[in-house]
Amino acid sequence: MNEQPQNSQMIRGARCVLGPQETTHALVHIAGGRITRILSSLDGSSGLQSDWEQIDLNGFLLLPGLVNAHDHLEFALFPRLGSPPYRNYIEWGDDIHNRFPETIAKHRAVPRDLRLWWGGIRNLLAGVTTVGHHNPLWPELQRDDFPVRVVREYGWGHSLALGGDLHQARAATPDGRPFIVHACEGVDELARAELWGLEQLGLMDQSAVLVHGLAIDREGIALMRDRRASLIVCPSSNNFLFGRLPDLSLLSGVEQLALGNDSPLTAEGDLLDEIRFAMRYCGVSALSAYQMVTAVPASILRLSDAEGSIRESGFADVIAVRDNGGSPAERLQSMSMADVEFVMIGGRVQLVSEALMERVPFSQTQGLEPLLIDGTTRWLRAPVSALLEKTEEILGKGKARLGNRRVLIPAAAETEHAV
């Protein structure tokens, strides 16, 4: 997604997040898809012009859009599959193809472009504005109207065992950009040895971004720190597959540690669910959790337009939730998809709750379509009615699940309840 040139806008009334523990009541001026000024509410009236479109977010906390470091967008509609525990990811992959071939085939029958859109919508609903997609950068992901930003400059390989020629993949990675690979995803010797296999191939350097790292030990952490490699963890996925949580007191020894939500094939839910899971079961502090979905993944993914923050000259990528008076980091402890009531990406409104529709100018909400998910209605800048109709032609009426949550078009939901 690219920022879109448009008239000047002003977000007013919200408590604006400047950092994990820092906020100010401010007027946020946006033009050309970027934040041009952040004015204190105390003296901001002098900078307010009558021709600016105003969005009233009084009573809300304005946060930076979240950065999801790791997802497989094409699997958003898949159910959680497996009969754990497993020893490693290869064992899991072999098992689900033997146990659930019909389920896998049915979901793969949904055209990939449709599934990618649902992956974007799943992230949008959770307040994610930028996502790292671990698979090819298919053309659909590069459309200007795709629901969220997808990182475009990166290299990737699946894993040491399943990634093919990793040397070639690394050589094809743009200079200075991340090379992302699953590693040490399991609890056995095969998983533990992968880090050293990557080292022997000469792939461990400051561009290396490992995903999972469950089997990494202290010696491995020392190697990663020496090579300045980064790590992305997906705790709920590890817990489901292997019955083991990542030791974040150990893994936090790497230079940069971010959080990703992985795919619904193995994960607990969306990125907000993953944040709460990590805080509850892995002992991640509110401050660390905030950094793991904002500044740190932005750094790991080499983002350069203030993604993960609210800053003058940066992209106007912001989300809004009801303000409970706590710090931004503390707010994450209870945040779920149902709390995200407003999302703007590049100055363009992408999501609005029903309660906020009347506060946002019509010019900003025109073209949004309603989606009912788990009893919550959100208006989205996506052709959700057509997407759902085409998806249900294959999966069956009422059978579509987005991140294991049921999705409906609100009118269809009303008809269903009336029967």
Residue ranges and their predicted role:
Residues W52, L57-G120:
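Metal-associated gating/positioning segment near the N- to mid-region
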Residues N68, L73-F75, E185, L265, ...:
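Short active-site segment of divalent metal-dependent hydrolases/proteases
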Residues G283-Q291:
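Short, charged, surface-exposed loops that flank catalytic or proteolytic processing sites
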Residues L271-A278, T294:
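Structural motif of enzymes handling amino- and sulfur-group chemistry
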